[in-house]
């Protein structure tokens, strides 16, 4: 789900257990801000010092909270602006001592004042609302139209999808994920692959599966929804680019190949390596 798909944001969901839209907005602010979550709001929430909705997630939270505590609206705005730009943290807000005194006069908790002083950058709530609304809509499809969701995700977002690595059962996927996790020297390519493998693992746990690539039915670049799963495209074969995939789909039209060699001669933008990989993936079984 966009906004909440990295390990960092998924752990944030585990730590906060959100139950309403407003909390999701705070989490969006936490993840897009600088020095807002780690070493700041997370510690306050985990320790029980404050709830998610009491901490600072977005710029607007500061001004609205300070006004609700009785501070002058203009001063509340100035504090918000200084904090969200990192001026307080950087020691460039000359009025900060006076503002602190004023906040204490209005019973603003010390933990809140200390939290403000740690912030380097704050996200605007309007942007958080737009992002979370988008994520919420996509989450609906993930729950209620899962195959449409996964087909779109793998077609557009999963650039690291490798049929040889990803089209396996749940146990094999889990082992591969652990293998990459435990490899301190894992490459950037392997890290990207692991993110895709995690979604494939989830896909399998939900009772779906990947069908073998089919030289007659597979699309060039998009995953096709089938009765119980997805049919991977030609571009999911390692090293097989979009140009060769589109050429293959065009040249197979109206054909009924009698051998692998005939297919290879017809679809001549595919290398022998591609043909061998397609054979290993069961693409010629039909």
Task: Please state what every model-predicted region is.
Residues 1-286:
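Noncatalytic, beta-rich nucleic-acid-contacting surfaces in large DNA/RNA-processing enzymes
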């Amino acid at each position: 789900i966009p906004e909440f798909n990295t390990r960092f944001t998924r752990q944030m969901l585990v730590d906060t257990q959100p139950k309403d839209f407003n909390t999701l907005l705070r989490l969006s602010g936490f993840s897009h801000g600088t020095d807002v979550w780690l070493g700041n709001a997370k510690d306050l929430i985990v320790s029980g010092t404050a709830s998610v909705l009491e901490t600072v997630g977005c710029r607007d939270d500061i001004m609205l909270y300070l006004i609700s505590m009785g501070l002058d609206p203009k001063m509340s705005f100035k504090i918000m602006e200084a904090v969200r730009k990192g001026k307080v943290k950087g020691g460039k807000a000359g009025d900060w001592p006076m503002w602190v005194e004023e906040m204490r006069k209005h019973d603003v908790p010390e933990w809140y004042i200390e939290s403000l002083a740690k912030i380097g950058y704050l996200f605007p709530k309007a942007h958080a609302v737009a992002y979370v609304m988008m994520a919420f809509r996509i989450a609906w499809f993930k729950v209620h139209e899962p195959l449409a969701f996964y087909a779109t995700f793998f077609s557009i977002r999963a650039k690291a999808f490798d049929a040889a690595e990803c089209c396996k059962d749940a146990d094999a996927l889990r082992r591969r994920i652990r293998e990459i996790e435990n490899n301190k020297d894992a490459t950037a390519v392997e890290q990207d692959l692991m993110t895709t493998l995690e979604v494939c693992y989830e896909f399998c746990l939900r009772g779906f599966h990947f069908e073998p690539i089919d030289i007659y039915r597979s699309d060039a670049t998009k995953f096709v929804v089938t009765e119980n799963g997805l049919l991977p495209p030609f571009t999911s074969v390692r090293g097989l680019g979009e140009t060769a995939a589109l050429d293959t789909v065009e040249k197979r039209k109206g054909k009924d190949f009698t051998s692998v060699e005939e297919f290879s001669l017809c679809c001549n933008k595919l290398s022998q390596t591609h043909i061998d990989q397609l054979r290993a993936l069961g693409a010629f079984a039909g």
